Amino acid sequence: MRRRLAGIAILGLLALTSACGGGGGNGSSAEPAEGPVTITMWTRAATQAQSERLVKAYNSSHKNQVKLTVIPTDNYQPRIAAAAGAKQLPDVFAADVIFVPNYTSQGLFLDITDRIAALPYKDKLAPSHMKLGTMDGRQYTLPHTLDLSVWFWNKDLYEKAGLDPEKGPKTLKEFAQQATTIQDKLGKDGKVHGTFFGGNCGGCYVFTFWPSVWAAGGQVMNAEGTTSLNDQPPMTDVFKIWRELYDKKAVGPTAKEEQGPTWTGFFPKGEIGVMPMPSTTLGLMPKDMKIGVTPIAGPDGGESTFVGGDSVGISSTTKNADAAWDFLSWTMSDDAQVEVMAKNKDVLARTDLSSNKYSSEDPRVVLINSLVAKGQTPFAPRFGQTYNDPQGPWLRLAREAIFGDASKLPQLNAEITKSLQQ
């Protein structure tokens, strides 16, 4: 998650993939192979663990086989672009869900609408992922891995500060109050801080701040992803609360310059009272650490999450569409979702399986799974250039809102809209 959030611009991708031409196909493939088939699959390192578990389980129980190649996250988009330009894509490839619309519009994925329609649980697939994998009413991808933003709180620090360790924040205002209490009661020696965030990381801001906007009933863009609403309430209300936390020194001192790689590293050390975190980090926390998990809320309540992670599709140049679909559809099955994903405390791609024999052992996991149906994944054709790029306009706006001159927000918001419309 941390490397994904740092993000890279995808201008080069669009230039390279323009050589591919054509649409996403109609669900057919070239001459299919007879007998057992070995298909190729690419994924980025950020989702290596989940991908390897799925492939291992499939290969051990099927005649067809999947050959998985894991590519360094920072090299993944250029690698996909180069392969697309040379018409040498693998049979199956996963992608950061945020960038799926770009791949789909370039014709890199096969149209699998009819195949998805035949799934008995087609209406139970992670809605945000399915939305971004749909173009002009046709569907091209399935959810692969999911990573959600939630609030973690350290129960031991809460108890030491005189807070109820079993009651995390239900509103962003409560979040701020509890973080401030932690800072006031425990932060005098500089080893403990109320909260933390990635203050110099565009992807970190969208992942952790935007859910508060959605929870309050607002939006950060129009539905087409071409107009920014980040200079309006409730976004400005969210910025104000976080700015007050920073001004009161209730935030770890390195937050202002945190570019993403280490923003989740302070909480597991027991140094932070309460903060937004990726759901995937829950299983990585120290075993003896008492952690509460609660949905991200708006200033006065509500709940939402940023539904991140990767979607997966069949390449439009595959010669093994049927074999590829056999694998992809299996990854959505009860067996794969429960015995592979849930068993390892991963977030499930199907909302009807959110409570299962493994997740029920940990109420926090049940809660995280339940948010898949409530969260959002923002759509914008130029998301990477605008929001993830460290030189993009979003990071400038967010930093002025928190650390600088908030009166500049209308001007900087216009720059975001300009970038979205280029």
Segments from the language model and where they lie:
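Conserved N-terminal structural module of periplasmic/extracytoplasmic solute-binding proteins
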Residues: 2-102, 117-121, 165, 270, ...
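Short helix-initiation/N-cap motifs at beta->coil->alpha
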Residues: 70-79, 98, 170-174, 254-268
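A structural signal for short loop-to-beta-strand junctions that line the ligand-binding cleft
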Residues: 83, 90-91, 121-157, 302-303, ...
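Hinge/lid segment of periplasmic solute-binding proteins
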Residues: 98-149, 290-294, 357-363
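Extracytoplasmic/periplasmic solute-binding protein
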Residues: 140-144, 149, 173-227
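Conserved C-terminal helix/tail region of periplasmic/extracytoplasmic solute-binding proteins
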Residues: 159-160, 165, 247, 375-422
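Glycine-centered hinge/linker elements that transmit conformational signals in sensory
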Residues: 178-180, 224-255
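C-terminal lobe and pocket-closing loops
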Residues: 279-288, 299-396
